[in-house]
Amino acid sequence: MTPAAPRALIAEDEPLLAAALQQELRAAWPELQIAATVGDGLSAVQQALALQPDVLFFDIRMPGQTGLDAAVALADAWPAHQPFPALVFVTAYDQYAVQAFEAQAV
């Protein structure tokens, strides 16, 4: 029996960037399944809890809730018996990248 393919959740409020990220991920990591793509931090938390993906790709600057705030909310709500997914922050803003590293992101 082969292990299940890893599943990912993408949280990106810019549709073109979300599509580009999906395309790049498919090319670089063919076995990765994109479980869902959402456009804001609140939906990211809800979908991550519902789908429990293996990898999260969060834009940092999103409407409603930033990716950083969504990651904190998700960590607080994540089931204790489940391993927390790998978290990758996606940003073009240096100041947010520093904050993400301080939060021990990938």
Pin down the residues of each PLM region.
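A generic structural motif
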Residues: 29-34, 83-85
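CheY-like receiver
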Residues: 46, 50-106
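Conserved acidic carboxylate
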Residues: 12
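Alpha-helical interaction/dimerization surfaces of two-component signaling modules
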Residues: 24-28, 47
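Charged phosphotransfer/docking patches of two-component systems
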Residues: 15-22, 97
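Non-catalytic signal-transmission and effector/linker regions of two-component phosphorelay proteins
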Residues: 1-9
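Conserved Asp/Asn-Gly motif in the active-site loop of CheY-like receiver
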Residues: 35-42
